[in-house]
């Protein structure tokens, strides 16, 4: 981490203030987990890199509530920050992907998913690498759909931040596209996207109309059992589950877009009339949870 002195300083300055982390700062916990990883699982780059990067998002998402410091969404935030660092380290793509998966999922309830070996190993390290006044054995359970056994069509749910490449991918698929952005743009063809979005956001009746149009299109494609692509951010488990519940006969696949944040930022600045605020990105980064097969996905592809 010598290449990132500013990040290390932030980790040293970020205190846990938690009964689950009485060892002190994020940096102290990171060092404890990394030391355990190198001794218990030597020459394991996935666990070593995950140990170094799993909590870097805590430096940016922490807030005080009821006298306690909370880091809600740090797993997702850490995942996106880690992409560029792993690229700087020239980490091979297969190892990079496994690290990103493990970072994103290191806070989920492992008893309810088919967790990978690295994820189970890292959970052990994460729990051992701290000083706790109260033991935390696991985390909140997740809610999944029950996949149908009789599928007639495929729904590809795209997952990623704005400007990560989802819409371009959807357009090249040649399939019907379910997109809230497209509905908003079609309502105001003479407006820029930002103008159209702000117009809709300022009027509850227009927001309701957009939702109605979205539901109508979704219902139509579900009823006709057509292959389609859902082009929205879909960063959270709940947002994906909401879509999946509307297709009774579909097989689901996910396509996850994880380009470096520098690429996303450059694309965001280069799109005339469509600039996504930083606060929106931060919110979506915090909501991000890596899709897993247990959610009901038959396959998951990654575009890094």
Regions found by a protein language model. Give the residues of each.
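Short, contiguous acidic/charged loop-to-helix segments that flank catalytic cores in large enzymes
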Residues: 20-23, 63-74, 197-209
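Glycine-rich phosphate-binding P-loop
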Residues: 155-173
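Divalent metal-dependent catalytic cores for phosphoryl transfer on phosphate-bearing substrates
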Residues: 36-134
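Pre-Walker A (Motif I) flank of P-loop NTPase domains
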Residues: 150-156, 225-226
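Conserved substrate/cofactor phosphate-moiety recognition/catalytic segment
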Residues: 168-226, 263-266
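Conserved GTP-binding G-domain of TRAFAC-class P-loop NTPases and closely related GTPase folds
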Residues: 176, 259-304
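Acidic/His-rich, divalent-metal-binding segments that scaffold phosphate/diphosphate chemistry
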Residues: 1-64
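Glycine-rich phosphate-binding loop used to anchor ATP phosphates in small-molecule kinases
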Residues: 204-252, 256
């Amino acid at each position: 981490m010598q290449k990132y002195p500013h990040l290390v300083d932030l980790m040293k300055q970020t205190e846990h203030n938690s009964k689950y982390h009485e060892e002190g700062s994020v940096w102290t916990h990171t060092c404890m987990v990394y030391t355990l990883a190198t001794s218990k699982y030597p020459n394991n780059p996935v666990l070593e890199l995950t140990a170094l990067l799993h909590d870097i998002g805590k430096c940016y998402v922490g807030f005080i509530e009821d006298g306690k410091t909370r880091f809600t969404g740090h797993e997702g935030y850490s995942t996106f920050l880690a992409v560029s660092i792993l690229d700087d380290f020239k980490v091979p793509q297969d190892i990079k992907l496994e690290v990103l998966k493990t970072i994103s999922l290191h806070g989920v309830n492992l008893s309810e998913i088919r967790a990978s070996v690295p994820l189970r190993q890292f959970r052990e390290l994460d729990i051992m690498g701290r000083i706790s006044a109260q033991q935390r054995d696991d985390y909140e359970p997740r809610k999944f759909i029950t996949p149908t056994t009789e599928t007639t069509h495929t729904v590809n749910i795209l997952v990623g931040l704005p400007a990560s490449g989802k819409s371009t991918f959807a357009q090249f698929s040649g399939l019907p596209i379910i997109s809230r952005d497209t509905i908003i743009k079609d309502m105001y063809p003479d407006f820029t996207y930002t103008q159209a979005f702000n117009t809709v956001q300022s009027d509850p009746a227009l927001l309701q109309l957009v939702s109605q149009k979205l539901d109508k299109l979704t219902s139509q494609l579900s009823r006709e059992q057509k292959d389609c692509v859902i082009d929205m951010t879909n960063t959270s488990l709940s947002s994906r589950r909401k879509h999946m519940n509307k297709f009774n006969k579909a097989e689901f696949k996910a396509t996850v877009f994880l380009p470096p944040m520098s690429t996303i930022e450059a694309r965001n600045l280069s799109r005339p009339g469509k600039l996504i605020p930083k606060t929106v990105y931060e919110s979506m980064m915090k909501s991000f949870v890596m899709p897993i097969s247990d959610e009901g996905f038959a396959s998951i592809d990654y575009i890094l």
